[in-house]
Structure formats: C-alpha cells, structure tokens
Amino acid sequence: MKDLLKFLKAQTKTEEFDAIKIALASPDMIRSWSFGEVKKPETINYRTFKPERDGLFCARIFGPVKDYECLCGKYKRLKHRGVICEKCGVEVTQTKVRRERMGHIELASPTAHIWFLKSLPSRIGLLLDMPLRDIERVLYFESYVVIEGGMTNLERRQILTEEQYLDALEEFGDEFDAKMGAEAIQALLKNMDLEAECEILREELNETNSETKRKKLTKRIKLLEAFVQSGNKPEWMILTVLPVLPPDLRPLVPLDGGRFATSDLNDLYRRVINRNNRLKRLLDLAAPDIIVRNEKRMLQEAVDALLDNGRRGRAITGSNKRPLKSLADMIKGKQGRFRQNLLGKRVDYSGRSVITVGPYLRLHQCGLPKKMALELFKPFIYGKLELRGLATTIKAAKKMVEREEAVVWDILDEVIREHPVLLNRAPTLHRLGIQAFEPVLIEGKAIQLHPLVCAAYNADFDGDQMAVHVPLTLEAQLEARALMMSTNNILSPANGEPIIVPSQDVVLGLYYMTRDCVNAKGEGMVLTGPKEAERIYRAGLASLHARVKVRITEEIRNTEGESITRTSIIDTTVGRAILWMIVPQGLPYSIVNQPLGKKAISKMLNTCYRILGLKPTVIFADQIMYTGFAYAARSGASVGIDDMVIPEAKAGIIEEAETEVAEIQEQFQSGLVTAGERYNKVIDIWAAANERVAKAMMDNLSVEDVVNRDGVVEQQVSFNSIFMMADSGARGSAAQIRQLAGMRGLMAKPDGSIIETPITANFREGLNVLQYFISTHGARKGLADTALKTANSGYLTRRLVDVAQDLVVTEDDCGTHNGIVMTPVIEGGDVKEPLRDRVLGRVTAEEVIKPGSADILVPRNTLLDEKWCDLLEENSVDSVKVRSVVSCETDFGVCANCYGRDLARGHIINKGEAVGVIAAQSIGEPGTQLTMRTFHIGGAASRAAAESSIQVKNKGSLKLSNVKFVTNAAGKLVITSRNTELKLIDEFGRTKESYKVPYGAVMAKGDGAEVQGGETVANWDPHIMPVVTEVSGFIRFADMVDGQTITRQTDELTGLSSLVVLDSAERTGSGKDLRPALKIVDAKGNDVLIPGTDMPAQYFLPGKAIVQLEDGIQIGAGDTLARIPQESSGTKDITGGLPRVADLFEARRPKEPAILAEISGIISFGKETKGKRRLVISPLDGSDAYEEMIPKWRQLNVFEGEVVERGDVVSDGPESPHDILRLRGVHAVTRYITNEVQEVYRLQGVKINDKHIEVIVRQMLRKGTIVDAGSTDFLEGEQAEMSRVKIANRKLAAEGKIEATFTRDLLGITKASLATESFISAASFQETTRVLTEAAVAGKRDELRGLKENVIVGRLIPAGTGYAYHQDRMRRKAQGEAPVVPQVSADEATANLAELLNAGFGNNKG
C-alpha cells in the first residue's frame, strides 16, 4: 500500500516555478500535447452510453471512463495499471486523465486565428501592413492577394479582384503567384524576414517627420521586435492544427428522460469536425473550385465561432436561440474562469445565520449556535470520539453525532475551546469585514455579535446575516488568532483612529452618567472615594448628577512610560466618580471629568491605546460598553411627543418671510427684478427663515431654568431626551431635530433644483397633502440614489484594488531625500486640517529647523509620533517636508520609511504589508456614503460665490506670497499679480487663515502689517476685472477709433458716457487689424517704461472693455484704466461625491480645462483667426516663442505684456491633472489629486489618511514616455514602466553610457491596471481577449510579483505571512538550491497532522 501511495504522489507532483510565459503555439507543439486525432464528430453511443471511437469523447485518445478499467472490460483492477488493451486500445489508468489529455484536429485547410485577426489593433494586419478589410476579403475568399510578384509589375501583398486576377493570369502566366484564403496569408507571413523588415523600418523612422507616420512605424517595430525576441513565428497565427479540449472539461451529462445536457463547446467542435471532414472529401474528389472555396470559408467560420463566438458576424446560436459559449467566453467576464473560479472560490466549512446583539460577550468572543457549531466541527468531533475510544469507526462516530448523545456536547465544548472562527459580513468592503472570534456556544439559532465591532462590519441587527468560516490548518488558526482577532483590530486602517468606539445606547448611558445637574440630591457631599460614591448612589442618598467633592488617587503616565501618583480632592459628580472605577491606571482623572460625548469617548480610547497599549484598551472598551448599557437603561431617556418643543417665535418668523416674499413678487410683476433673481431671492429668504427657526428651537431645547441651593434661578444644559441624544452624538443631529420641532424647510426636486415653496410645518405638527407630496420627491430620489451608489462605489473599489494590488512594502529604506512639503489645510478663515494631523505617522525627509534659529528640531528620517508632533506644535512649525510613497525610489514596491506608520497598528509599517490593497479599501469603503448627485449652485450657494472682500477672523500679522502690487495715490496697495495668497500669522508664527486675493484688489495694509480680528483687509468688485496701471503719467489712446474699434455709450441713470471696445467680430473691415490700447506717456509725450523692464507701459484692451477716461487725462499708479465685465459664472454644475472621485482617479480631462502657460515668458497676442486668438509667450532669455490658439469665448486672465511663470493659469477653468504633471511636476499633481479627493470626503465627514491617496497616485504614475532612448533598448515615444527605465539607466550610468530621458505619464486607474507588467492580472481585470492576444504575440513573461497573479496560480501571496515564504524562495533560488519538496504523500501528511492536533487536544483536559 505504501508503494501505491508513493506512486500516487509522483503523479501529482507540481514543479516549482518562478514565472509564467505565454506564447503562440506552433503546430508541432499542439501535436505534441495531443494523444490522438479526433476524426469523427460523434460523442457517445446513445444506446450503450459508451464513447464512440475517434469521436470527441473517445476513450482511446483521452483515457478510460472508469478508474483502472478499459472500455471493453477485458482489463479491470489496479494490477493491470499501464496496460494498453489490444482490443479497444484504451490505456488502463485513472479516469482523471480525461481532464488532462488533449486531442487535436488536423485541418484540411489553414485557418486564421480570429483573436490575432480581429482583436484591435489587428496583429496580422499590423505585421503585414495591410488594412484589416483587405485581409478579411482574402480570408473569406472574395479576392486574391499577390504572394510573389516575380518579374511582373504586381506588388507583393497587392489585392486583386477575380477579374484582375484573370487578366494578370492571361498577361503574365506563371510569372507571379497569387492565392486566396488563409493559405495566402500564411504564405505571406512565412515569407517575411522579420529582422530585415525591422532594419528598413528603423531607417524610415529616422527619416520621417510626420507624427502619425512615426506612431505607426513605432507600433510596427515594436510588434516585429516582439516576434523576433519571443521566438514566435508569424505563421503560427494561422492554425493548421486545432487542439481539442480534454473531454471532462466539456462534459456531456445524462439528464433523466434519456436526454443529455452538453457543454456548448461540443456543438462548436462538432461543426468544425463535420466541415473539416466534408472539405477533405471534396478535396479528394477534386470538386470544382467554387464548392471547395465555400467549404473552406465555412470551416474558417466554424473555427472562428469555436475560438470566439460573435467576434465576427452573427453569433452562432444553439437550439434555444442563445449564442453558444465559446472558448473566449469561458475565460472572460464576471462569470469567466478568472473572476468566478480563480479569484473567488466557494468555501466549505462555513455557515450563515442572522445576527443578534451579544451585550454580555467579551470583545474577542462571538456567540455560535450549538447546532451550527456541531455541523461545522463534525470532523474534529469524529476524530475526538475515535481517539477517546468512544466510537470504533468513523461510521459509528457519525451515528453518535446524529443522535446528539450527551458526550458529543462535551467533546464539542473541548474542540471549540481556543479554536477561533472567522465571521464575515457581506459586502466585505475593507479588511475589517472579516475578523476572528472565539466561539461561545449558545442556544437558539442566531449568531451573537459583540456590539463594539458593528462599526467595523457596518452591521446592524435589523435582519443582517453573517457567515462563519472555520480555519482548519494550524497555520490558519495561528493567523486567525494573531492577526485577525477582533482585539487586534482596534484602529481603523483608513485613518488610524479607534474603530471600536461605542455608539448609540452606550454613548447615551455614559453621557447621562457624566452630566451634572444643579441642586441634585446629595449636592455638596465630600466623599472618600469612588467606592463610597457608588454606595451612596445605590443607597439612593445622592443622584447620579450631584456635584460633589471626591478624593481621587490618579497615576498619570506619559507616553514614555514614566508615571507619577497623586491624590487630591476633586470637584466632580457622583456619576463621574463611579465611571472612574473602570478607567485603567495610568490615565488622568480629567479624562472622565467632563460630559462624555461620542468624540470624547473616542479620544479617551485613543489616548488609552497610545499610553497603555493594546490589552488595557480592550478591557477598558468592554467595561465602557457594559457600564454604558447599564446606565442607559437606568436613565430612562425615552422620547415623548412633548420633548419636541416648538419655539414660540416660529409663527412670527414665518410671517415675516411671507411678507418679504410677497414684496419680491410685486417687484417681479412690475419688472424690477428678473425671474431668476426673484427665484434666488425667495430661496434665500426661506433658507434664512429656516435658520432662524432652527436657532430659536435649539436655544429653547438646549437650556432649562432651575433653582439652585440658594434659591436663585439659573440656566443649565437641558435634560430633554431628544436634545441629550443629539448632544452626546448617540443618535440624531440638529438638522433632524429641526425637522421634528422647527420647520422642514426647502425641498429639492429629483433633478436637484430647489422648490421655492418651503414646508413650513414640522413633523410634530404634521404635514398637509401638498407638503407631503413635495416631501416624497426627495425621499424617492434618495432611494434610487442609494441603489445606484452601491454599484458605482463597488466598481470604483474594484478598479482601485486592481491598480494597487501589487504594491507591497519590500524594503526598510530606499534612501531618498525627496518628499513632499506638508502644510496645514486652510480654507478661508478656518484651519480645515492642522499640520499635526497631516504629518502624524510620517517620516521626515530632511531636518526640521526650529523657526527663527538654526537649531535642528527634528532630525532626518524620524517617524513623527504624538510626542514629536507636540514638539512641532510647541515651536509652531508650519511646514514639514516628509517622505512619501510617490517619491519612493524602491523599484518594485515601496519602502517602510516612505510609507511611515502602519495606521492600524501604530508603529512603523512592517515589510510585506500589502499597502496597495489597504489603500484601495480605505478609499473605496466609504464610497457608499458619498453622494451621487451633481450640485447646482443656486440660491444660498451663489451668494457666497461672489465674494467682494476679505475679512480676517483672528488677530495677527499679514503675509503675502507671490505678490506684485503698486501703491496708489491714496497710499493703498493695488494687487497686480494673478495668484496672490494672503495668510494671517499669529504671534507664534502659525498660519491661521489663508485667502486668495484676486487681480485688482485694493488692500489697506501690506505685507507684515498687524490686523485685528474682524478687520477687512482687501476689497474688489467681483463683477468686473480691472486693468490697473503700474505707472503714473498721461493717457494716450492708440488705435481707439470711434466707430471702428470703439463706440460711445451713455448710461441712462447717471448720464455719464463711456467708451466700449468692440469685439473683433463687430468691427468693420479697416478696424479688424487695429489693436486698441492705452499708452502711458510723461508730460513730454515720451513713453513711460514699466519699472524694472525696458518695455513701454501700454495696455491692450480686449473686446467689451469699458474705458471711462478721456485721452490725455493724468492718472496715478494703481488707478483703474478700464474695466472688463465678467460674465457671472452662472449656475455651473459642480460634480460632487463619488463621480468626482472617480473622475480624479481616472485622470479624466475636464470639458473646458484651465489653460496653463507652457513656458515662462512675456505674453503677447498674434494674428487672430475666425474663432480663435493666438496667444504667444516669448521667453525672457530670447529663445523660441511658444504659440497656442485659444477660442475667443474663453476669458483670459492675462494682458499683453504680462510676465507669466510656467504652469500659471492663463484662462480659468478646472485644471487638468495631465497639464499639472507636465508643467508643474509630480509633487504638484500628487498634491492636486490628494486635496481634491480629500475635499469630497471631508464634505461627508469621512477621514482618510493622505498616504492612501498617494499610494494610488504612485500607481497612476507608473509609466513614462521615452523622449530620447540613449543607449537603451527602448524606442522613442514608447511607453515604458518607470521601474524598468530606472533600472536600465542605473546600469548605463555604471557603464558610463548615455542614459534614456523620459517624461512621466499619468494614467487613469483603469488604464494603469491594464498597462501593468503582469498579463495575468490585467487579463483578470478587463478586456481579457485583448490583453491575452497582446501578451501571446510578445511572448510575455509574468514574473508573478503582484498578489492577484499569485492567487490565480494558487500560491501564497507575496505579502503578509506569504512574504517570508517568497523571500525564502528567492534566497534559495539565488543560492541555486533545489526546491525542497517533502517526499510525503498527502494522506500521510493528513494523518500526521491529525495526530498532532489530537495530541494537542488530548492535553487540554487536565
């Protein structure tokens, strides 16, 4: 028996491999795989059910139908193994060879492989340099192609129609050779000399100048070189032998009633064989040409359908009008081999059930129904029963378990102890969607879940179901316990904050417990400690909220672990003293001496984790939960209708609003305001009224009057249940209370526009029919949105995972000095995100210098933890250069220092961590919370849009950056630069506020000036763009001819006249070439020069500019010469939410992108064309100018003669990330994408760490375009992997040769996924056919670097615990050791493992 096992093992041995190569199969190769030719289309004999000989299921070719038994039954049993039966010709072996052995069909006529023909760009077409239409006409026997021209005037590859061919035959006879069909194409491909062709093309490439031609040549050269290097022969793209899939992979299953269910492939193969045999017969009979041709065409079509049905012409359908599933369909799409069977498999040993609350569980436990546990752990129980000698055989054990004898339950208890199970809730959006717990057996049929892990699973108990999986092997159990246990996943990988935070009841309980109340029972007592506080509370001598003095002993520990103990009498409340009893030692009392809301509790857990570590935090979290539930139950905070107090002022406010609306309506009817203005104003009025009602209501709800001990009335925070729920963060929000007790306010239509009649009622008063009807609009839209959102969000996550899946931490330090400069995110007057939050957990890229000195505050390569961040804050540092994955120099993967802290663990990241997948999940998981809609700016929003001044909020000093200004006669500054930034610095040098100052703004105070809070520092008119003069002098009109370039207009109200410059479209013939301008001259009439240049001060005026000055008037620097009216940006739609995130990651170019200056230099305008202006930028160093045509309707931000820097905005609009990368570099584009994505998430209140977005950006920047190949093998204009280019350049630099130069490319995530090095990963993502075709032609090797490829080939992934295994393999390979394959059979190994496990279980008894 042992020998037999050894033999079996030898059969199933897998070779260790490092890479997978895909290439074209040559006919000989196909024959070498084959075990015989399939000659007949028959499948099985319908009477005997035996396979027909030489048919598609033939036992002689493919192997026996039953194990170790030949077809005719002469040889049965194992002893005849390997014998070939002389009667039926079947080899006696296992039947599973029918899954492995292939057959083949010898085609009577060559056939083109449809993938290489039709998959665009057509490989055959590109190789032969013939259009696809022509090749198809040849293949499907419509025309001839010349193969050898001989001495005639016919070109090779020339297409001839039937008539032309006959004419040529008459004229030249046998001089030339022309054929039709696949034979012709095959002959053409065979005759190609690839290397010679390559040389010719390279020469052509050097000579040609046309861009399109270059592109085409490069494509052809790449393809030819791929063929040469891979050893593929072009003629192999034409099939002469067709392989036949093993029969068990295209089974034929008998159904009841004598019918059969068959795989579609059998039908397709039958067609091919039938047509092939018919063609052979016709050729033997020497049938007329036309019949043979027709048959050949039919054969070509049959082979096409087998390989890829529906790719050409109509798909071949089966009996039920459904297209047949071809070989290509088997592998592509969601139901294909890749996604259905290789990347996601079904799991045995799993169960699922509804979940319910387990409030008494510990954090690492889950309640598992006994019935389910018994089923899941059956094999373990059988083993235990046998081991104990309670059952003699497995069968007996089975019976015992089925009878559910008492001993079985005892054994189940033992088996389950210390054996973790995995719980998973679909959809698993991030890695916390599967966690491990220790099961506790419970009665009933529902799984019990610990309430604190609900946030991670996004679970609630309204009928959610969860799946249970059992890790079987020791390794799996170890990983479940060490890595996946719920107690090890306290922090969220997305932002590093605790994810095990109490919510709802628990928060309410703690909040209620820690509130204080004036004049409560027992106020003013002095207690000896928390124990006494609890005693008097239980005895009913004092209320929970009573303000008392308590003696507290606290041990305060800082992050270094030093601790000091101090005892003091503290003013606090009874409830807080009781809560202090569960707080672990080492935290200060101040942490509970406050009303605890959700934020405070989260902060408390975070502090606890940072100071005390994992174990105390877990215990503390559990205690918080138990306490919270207990006191929430005691609080009796329930909601009654009287809790929704409607403010008395409501009626008055609504009345006022209605009068205002009526007034506006009158103005509209008398024609004073436009319809649009009326609508906007009405909406503004109602929005303001709603705010006022809400404010009145909240003021009313949030405080109550009480009498204190001295009999004086004072106000205290209200104990209204609804208010407490919202205030603590347990449930509900001010906006929801507003709908209950204020007014519902304005509603939106499904298209997002606002209905102008608001709902003045609230839910307590109830809605009337009209109000209810208006409400339904929004509600239904919400439901429809949610459904769409889920699908879109899931697809975004899938693309993100796909692009980042191969990014793993592979080394400790790449040694780079590059990084990105982090500053706090400031919008207007608010610090949206302080510097501390942005740099926490990053590594410094260079020393941080103490502001105002030369001392080093933080050395280079320091991981900034909480301590360092405190130091930065104390010294008010406001920018730090930190390492980033975008600038990491590691070739494949990233280094730990560039990534920084592992957010879910709180220390620097470990090698082998799959940061790419974590990033993708962190960005994708909150996707369902983002909105789907496009916002219309209307009403309230548009008011904010047209700002006209900057008012600072805090006291401090001003700091202007990128500023140019002139001082006008009044001594004020007039800004003449485009992207000026104004910052407000406090006395510690920290940036508090930041604003953009537009061109032409007037500022009373300049750089460095002190300002008070609330002071207005800049003013401008938002509706016009001024032209500001930088010099003083007299105005001289140039080319300002009345009626030709300008026209006079008189304002009806004021009677003032002004000149308006005509648009070039409105000018008459002679005025077209004139360029109206204002020159500034001195008293003598000489040109005044612009300070610091030798250019005369003259200001060209664009069309529509308004001039209110007369010729010859004296003006001073900083005066406005002309005004250009700005069309208000109107109601532009802002794409928000999920679509915006998708657009950013797909790097889509916006519809009308901002135009950026390509080079630095001076602006001027060249000759105009009909619809466009010519913008010319002349560099200051006098090199060649850059020209660009810009449509006339685009508003330009620059005037003639202005100096711009490369990358400055010339015309406003959304910026295109590609332009930013080209003109401002990698860091600018990283910053842009990060900030824009964060903006969307910040609106929804979702926190995601920047580094996740940077990880995705790094993957988008993987490719570069070669500008100059140097001594490398790259082609100019070729897109190559950056890591490849860098490696090649390093090698060349070492040899002292010319390195390649390149520009970085930004690819969208879908494109980047498809352009990955690994063809297996790309094929399993999208466009499987195209990817595989391309890879096969190039003979690509997949190095199996990423996670996906390794999952697909069935290996451990090179990340996490599999990282060590792969490193070990690499090391052995480098040392040239043979792979260690244990010479044990599978059965032996299982037996050994069972012994080990059982031994382990046996010892547990004691």
From Swiss-Prot:
GO terms for cellular component: DNA-directed RNA polymerase complex. GO terms for biological process: DNA-templated transcription. The keyword Zinc applies. Zn(2+) 1 binds at C70, C72, C85, C88. It is an enzyme of class 2 (transferase). InterPro entries: DNA-dir_RpoC_beta_prime, DNA-dir_RpoC_beta_prime_bact, RNA_pol_asu, RNA_pol_N, RNA_pol_Rpb1_1, RNA_pol_Rpb1_3, RNA_pol_Rpb1_3_sf, RNA_pol_Rpb1_4. NCBIfam families: rpoC_TIGR. Belongs to the RNA polymerase beta' chain family. Binds 1 Mg(2+) ion per subunit. Binds 2 Zn(2+) ions per subunit. The RNAP catalytic core consists of 2 alpha, 1 beta, 1 beta' and 1 omega subunit. When a sigma factor is associated with the core the holoenzyme is formed, which can initiate transcription. DNA-dependent RNA polymerase catalyzes the transcription of DNA into RNA using the four ribonucleoside triphosphates as substrates. The gene is rpoC. Its EC number is 2.7.7.6. It catalyses: RNA(n) + a ribonucleoside 5'-triphosphate = RNA(n+1) + diphosphate. Zn(2+) 2 binds at C814, C888, C895, C898. Mg(2+) binds at D460, D462, D464. This is DNA-directed RNA polymerase subunit beta'.
